[in-house]
């Protein structure tokens, strides 16, 4: 006989099912390994030989009417949350004084019915359901040392049996929440109790009583064969995994007489009928088809293209954070300025925004306010003027950082500006800010006590104002001081017909502006050729209207 291959992987496996968990069925086979077990396989392996059947040498039935082999091997099919009583529970609940809870009395009634109907169907294999007061200490008790002889203390065992439960309570519609959604000053106990998401679980343990023959019903001989956990999302956790094609699991008992047991766990849940599977397949196909049609109706069938020579700029941005400012409770006012030449935006487009007020948090040596405020906008660039050799201007993002205190006093903390990236992709930009200041102590006292300070009338003065027409801009006499920084995260998308042109014989242009300039050159050449055709057509019409005697008959005039 070949050597038995044991399965040593006792880790848990996770499954997901959309079917009701009540349909779950497991077949558990338990057998004690003895020398006679191996001999019983010999006749089947050597059929056709003149051998004596080993059944002759098997032990005879005992006085109780059961052979020892039947007690050493058991196979049973168990359903989800099906209660199978152990011999210890049968002996315990037969005594009415041991019953303390309604569940104990219910178990007592069930055990009495089983005794009247001929006894329970299981011998060594039994279960602990989600309602039972049982906790696997090996799973919940964390060892403090690496010693194999470490035993959990009495307090650890009692605390492991305290099971956390969370009822799925759904509030009434329109009801008022009694608890606060945000706790501004959490205590250490609050953080310790709420930092873990506690998902409601239903647990079931499949156990085995591996005590000696006719000495069942002792807690010290109980061993966990399999643990099943199911949550409300249909996630099923099995530890250890189903046997399948792997070898059986093994258990070695401790004590004076060590014994070796093997067991297998198989999923024998009933399969759906072909008609039910086909009906479910049609339902899901119809559902997915309707969802696909809904998404298609949102997207549309026509892909929106830009006009030739135009660039569409789409920006998904985020005001990430601000740090390094004097006062707390910050908020940011920002807007995008489009250059007057070549740039435009839809009429409904909003190019400005204001973040929420955010309290700063100490991070290293700085106080940081995390906004995570999203914004989006789009703009169009149309390159038409070829006479100008200057590079086209790009949109500019301006920001103004302000603080607001408890008395509704606001202060300007800084101004800043940054040019939007000219390349598509994700960009993280840090904008340094400054603010105008006044000399003297009175200005600082006014800023501290009543708020308010010098402000810019035009925020575009941070760079070059749009109303400026000269060659040089002087800021002489403006006193400023450097303040903090604002971090932006921008995801830029660019769309243009120029991106559709690709040729292996031509080198890739350096930027989209080069491609747009090529479109303008092609348009200029097209305009010249069209003007030449119109002039030639007018010349031919003029010749046809001339008298014939003015035209040379000898053909000297050749068009």
From Swiss-Prot:
Changing residue 166 to W: In MKS1; uncertain significance. One of its GO terms (cellular component) is centrosome. It holds the Pfam family B9-C2. Residues 311-439 form the C2 B9-type domain. Its main location: cytoplasm. The lineage of its organism: Eukaryota, Metazoa, Chordata, Craniata, Vertebrata. This is Tectonic-like complex member MKS1. Component of the tectonic-like complex, a complex localized at the transition zone of primary cilia and acting as a barrier that prevents diffusion of transmembrane proteins between the cilia and plasma membranes. Involved in centrosome migration to the apical cell surface during early ciliogenesis. Required for ciliary structure and function, including a role in regulating length and appropriate number through modulating centrosome duplication. Required for cell branching morphology. It is found in: Cytoplasm, Cytoskeleton, Cilium basal body; Cytoplasm, Cytoskeleton, Microtubule organizing center, Centrosome. It is linked to Meckel syndrome 1: A disorder characterized by a combination of renal cysts and variably associated features including developmental anomalies of the central nervous system (typically encephalocele), hepatic ductal dysplasia and cysts, and polydactyly. Bardet-Biedl syndrome 13: A syndrome characterized by usually severe pigmentary retinopathy, early-onset obesity, polydactyly, hypogenitalism, renal malformation and intellectual disability. Secondary features include diabetes mellitus, hypertension and congenital heart disease. Bardet-Biedl syndrome inheritance is autosomal recessive, but three mutated alleles (two at one locus, and a third at a second locus) may be required for clinical manifestation of some forms of the disease.
